[in-house]
């Protein structure tokens, strides 16, 4: 899980979702998991 100030899709299977008020990227590739920090 990468924590970044700005999250972007890294491939076509990445999906941007909002969970508990945080923007996250979920993907079939575990390296592409991201969460938006403060």
From Swiss-Prot:
Superkingdom assignment: Bacteria
UniProt keyword Metal-binding present: no
GO terms of biological process kind: translation
GO molecular function: structural constituent of ribosome
Protein's UniProt keywords contain Plastid: no
Keywords (A to Z) from UniProt: Ribonucleoprotein, Ribosomal protein
One cellular component (GO) term of this entry: ribosome
Pfam families (alphabetical): Ribosomal_L36
PANTHER family: 50S RIBOSOMAL PROTEIN L36, CHLOROPLASTIC, LARGE RIBOSOMAL SUBUNIT PROTEIN BL36C
Family per record: Belongs to the bacterial ribosomal protein bL36 family.
Protein name, entry field: Large ribosomal subunit protein bL36
The organism's taxonomic lineage, starting at the top: Bacteria, Bacillati, Bacillota, Bacilli, Lactobacillales
């Amino acid at each position: 899980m990468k924590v970044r100030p700005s999250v972007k899709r890294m491939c076509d299977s990445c999906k941007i979702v909002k969970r508990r008020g945080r923007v996250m990227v979920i993907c079939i590739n575990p390296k592409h998991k991201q969460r938006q920090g403060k």
